[in-house]
Amino acid sequence: MLRPLFLYACTFSLICAQEILQLDKIEVEDHYSVIEERKENSIAKRIIQGEELTQYGDMNALEVLKRTPGVTIPEGKGKKGAPGKGYTKVLVDGEEISATSKRRGSPLEQISPDMIERIEVMTNGSAEYTAEAMGGIVNIVLKKPASEGKTIAKVTGGIYNEQPMASVFAQQEGKNGDLSYMFNATYADNTHKDDSSTHIDEPPSVTEKITDEEGRFRALSLNSKLIYTPNAKTKYSFDASLGVNDNKSSSDERIYTNGTLSNVIHNRDESEGVMLWTKLAGQHHISGTELAEWKLKFHQNDSDGETRSGSQLQYDDSLFRVQGAEGSYSRAQGEHFIKTGAELKRLSQQEDIRVLNNGIETSNEHQRLRQDKSSLYAQDEISIGENTVLTPGIRYENVSRDFGASSRLDYFAPSMHLLYRLSLNDNLRASIAKTVKLPRLDELSENVDSSLELNDLNHPDVSGNINLKEEKALSYEVRYEHFFEDKGIISIGGFYRVIDDKIEKLTTLEGGRYIERPYNAGEAKLWSIEMELKKSLDSYVSGLGIFGNATFQNSSLTLNDSKRPIKGTNDYLYNVGVDHTLSAYRLTYGTAYRYVGGYDDPMDENGIAESQKGYGTLDLYASKRLDSTFKAGVNLKNLTGTTIETTTKRYTSGSLVETQIDRENSEPHILFTLEGRW
């Protein structure tokens, strides 16, 4: 029976329902325990191991997530991708990231991959996590101090389109009596140089926009983690992070009308940001089968910026703050592993925006949002015989919002997960969960962001909708897994999701400018088939491993008896790659190719149709152990020189009146690393 296993597991970690799986590859080294955990645990949770996060030369956590299956990061159309702004909820050590302003970058850009222990991806909700998990949950787990003393230093340098890139990472960890500690620091200084083009055909005129952009991003991150263990039953931890950054970019936009240069617009954007995270937590083993945990947290992200576009100047200040407390109680009893918990959290967000045109103030707007959320949950992992584990749960959340006018809503989010072991090496999994997505501040605010002097279909002004309602979804998932004897896996699965009050963003032409606003469009359905293969080929070629995964998806949105796809739903995407280790030379090298399929959206309610071509990215890496202390590496990134091409068409009374084609280009770049461990 599984009862002894549950008793031992809860004593040490009390997280019995976590599945560990490497998403992108099978390491040639021994990861037998990783595969075994996937076979045994009841709630599917994919995990990218720490050693995978640095080998492809990603400079920060945001770049890491862009190559992670199951994570939604919009790209193209001149809009900066940022996870957490869509349907995928991104957490850092279980805490929601500070989303700050839609005008500024993500705090994930300040997290070095060297700080990350693993990334967990869960594609369906469970009671233990937030109900706002409509597109799944990504949890970035930061490293904890090791028991033995260790010093790590890493230097990275490279070139992107003739522009320098550099970063330095240093970490010290160890243990002194009952106190374990870890301190690390990261400094990054990266520049870039890109170009893009826009072709607008609006008879009788044809407009070409050619944009050359240069930028520089600098960031310093200081982090500490302390763990105090006075006895075998009690543990306290304190985490603190301070990050500062500044970002400067400038661009020249040359505009040609019917082949003649008609205008040149100089754009400049400068910003500074400060991020502060603190957390105090405790674990108390009440008995060999009971554990109580608590946590106090304070997070704040502050940024201010200045944007100049032609004769227009905009100042913006943003503040995002989270204060909260939570506690949980876990108990293993017979064939049950029960966990209950409660959470209180206050979120405060504010934005101040001042706009001047030719030196004259044209607007001065202030946006405020305060949200109080209380949550209760209960979850039970039930072992039924030798082959079945059932995990029911329910979560209740009560949300109070003050945004000009007050609003209050509450909801239940039940979930059910099933694991059935068909044989020693075959699993069948199924789950059903109810989730929600609450509108963000920028989606509610009716103030218009018009920071660009000239706008177009793909670069509109942005406004919100104060009448926006939350989305609610019911998600079904099923998956079959087969585990090879030689540390590999093949799986096939899929999900079906029904979404009420789906939020879609629609663009209209108002007063000669395009404005994009969110609306509750109707009932949506999204379904997908997912396949995965990871295999060690060591029996054929020593040290060789392959990996691959693919997702095929489709969608529909019903509004007033008419149907169309959900906007921007890619037809498919896939990842393939190979890794090879030459043990005699202490050398590992590999390649990975990621392709994102396009989409073709028909005309929406406002007469706008949009399509995007698929694009692929090829990366190569090699690393060599020089001796017991040093390791060197080289990364060739984006060898395909990716171009994202988006075509947008505007119709009036059924007739095509405007076509716009945007091309955003990115260049190959090379990175060199030297890492030492003492």
Regions found by a protein language model. Name each.
Residues E37, K45, L62-T100:
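Extracytoplasmic beta-strand/coil segments of soluble accessory domains associated
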Residues A61-V64, V90-L91, S106-E109, V121, ...:
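N-terminal periplasmic accessory domains that precede
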Residues E95-T123, A170:
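Short acidic/polar hinge/loop motifs at secondary-structure boundaries
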Residues D269-M275, E365-K373, S407, N427, ...:
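Outer-membrane beta-barrel signature, preferentially recognizing the C-terminal barrel domain
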Residues Y595-D600, S623-W678:
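C-terminal beta-signal and adjacent terminal beta-strands/loops
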Residues I26-Y56, G84-K89:
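N-terminal periplasmic "start-of-domain" segments of outer-membrane beta-barrel proteins
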Residues I490-I499, L509-E510, I515-M603:
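Gram-negative outer-membrane beta-barrel transporters
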